[in-house]
Every structure is written in C-alpha cells, then in structure tokens.
Curated annotation (Swiss-Prot):
This is Uncharacterized mitochondrial carrier YFR045W. It holds the Pfam family Mito_carr. Keywords: Membrane, Mitochondrion, Mitochondrion inner membrane, Repeat, Transmembrane, Transmembrane helix, Transport. Belongs to the mitochondrial carrier (TC 2.A.29) family. One of its GO terms (molecular function) is citrate secondary active transmembrane transporter activity. It comes from the Eukaryota. It comes from Saccharomyces cerevisiae (strain ATCC 204508 / S288c) (Baker's yeast). The lineage of its organism: Eukaryota, Fungi, Dikarya, Ascomycota, Saccharomycotina.
Amino acid sequence: MANQNSDLYKQITAGSVAAVFQTTMTYPFEYLKTGLQLQPKGTAFEIILPQIKSYFVGCSALNVAAFGKTILRFVTFDKLCHSLNNNIDNNDNFQRLTGYNLLIAGTLTGIVESLFIIPFENIKTTLIQSAMIDHKKLEKNQPVVNAKATFHKVATKSTPVARIEKLLPAVKHMYQTRGPAAFVQGTTATIFRQIANTSIQFTAYTAFKRLLQARNDKASSVITGLATSFTLVAMTQPIDVVKTRMMSQNAKTEYKNTLNCMYRIFVQEGMATFWKGSIFRFMKVGISGGLTFTVYEQVSLLLGFSSRS
C-alpha cells in the first residue's frame, strides 16, 4: 500500500509538470481557437492574428486548472479503478481495466475534471475576450442592466466587454459584475463536451487501431493518433463553440440558455460557425498528446519510477 501511494504521488507530480508544460506550449492555439469562436459572422480573421503579444493572455488560469485537474484526475481514476475492478488480490494490486469498465472510469473522471475546470475556463474566456476588444470602442458603450434576450431575438444592446489583463483582477471583475454565476457559465455544454470527448476518443482510437493492426510500426501509431484527433475535433467542435459563447462576458444578455445559443448561432451565423476554430483545436489536440507523453516520461525517469506501471 505504501509503494502504491508513493507511485501515485510520483504519477501526480509527473502528470502535473507535463500538463502545465503542454498547456503553456499549446496555448497560442487555444487563444486563436477561442478568439475565432467569440467572433460573430463576418468578422475578419485579421482582428485576431496580429495580436501576437496577447497569445498567452489567460494562460495562467489554465495552468492553475491543469495542475489541479491532474491531481483530481489521478486520484479519481485510481479510486474508480478499485471500485470497478473485482480482480483485486491480497496485496491490493489490481489488473488494468478493459472494455466498458475503462470507458466508464474515463468518462466519470472526465466529468469530475470538467466540473473542476469550468471556473478557470470562464476566467480564460473573459481574459481572451477582453484582449480582443478595441479600447476606444469600449469607451463609447454604456452598460445595459435590464437587456434580455428572447428565444428568437437578440437583446437590442449587449453588455460591454471590460478590458482586463490579469488573473486576479479578472476574478474580481467577474464576481462584481456577474456574481458567482460568472464562474459556472457554460456548465451544461462543458459536461456534454467531456462526455462526447471521452466516448468518441475511446471509440475512434479503438476503431483506427484495429483498422491498422496489421501495421505494427511507429507510422501506424502516428496515423491512429492523428485520425483519432481529427475525428474528435470534427464531431465535438459544435459543442466547443457553444461552450465558448456561453462563457463570454455578455452571454447573459445575448443568450437565454444553451439551446437558445445553438439556435441563434445556426439561424444568424450559419452552420459553418459551429466549426470555427477547428483547425487550431486540431493542432492543439494533435500536439498535446505527444508533448504530454514525452514530458511525463522524462519526469518519471527523474523520479525513478516506470511511467508504464
């Protein structure tokens, strides 16, 4: 039991370092993806591209989330593995989960992670949206307190977006202007996205691996990973777009609820809007796996334990 706990702590350490490194290195893709998703139809891409200095705005929020999420992931998954696996011997060792038990453990762990990171995702979105706003335009806008969106119509005026550049001021502003609800916006879309992520990734990876099982080489592993990432992004991007919109600073006056958000995007902006930012998300997802695995392996070696155990 002592060795098992020691290995778990080492896994958490290696996983946390890998998660923070991966989040930082791929954050420009996250910024561009979120920035595109926040733009209404007809907004030029050039509005986002030149703001290179802003490419790491909001990264601190996701790094805090990545650290906490990693701890939660290992502890939750470890507990679920013990709960779902009946093949536990006297030394309290258990065989790896397979099939539906693995899918259940992964999905439940993903939901717990998602609930944890929702406040940080909201902070990130607030900071990115703020970084994209022209300060001169903000001075002309006045806040609208009672504006409400109906199911079919947008509010006549929307709440202006504040210009905030740092983590703690963002948290303070969100609480003062929107209350505690500001940190749980987009919860429904986030949970659905996580369930879809886990299910599609598990299914797609298994399918592509079986399809290429005759080719037992590095190339097949790369192809499987890329094909899985492409499938994941293609099928879950609409949920991701809705999640981002529901986390925006003016979501409360723009959208009545998640379904209203989906409806209005479809009617007012067109079907293609649901796949905004998909290229950058694919780049992030494709690179993230390799970065995380590589850093995790190296930190595992430094800590003196096998990352495959």
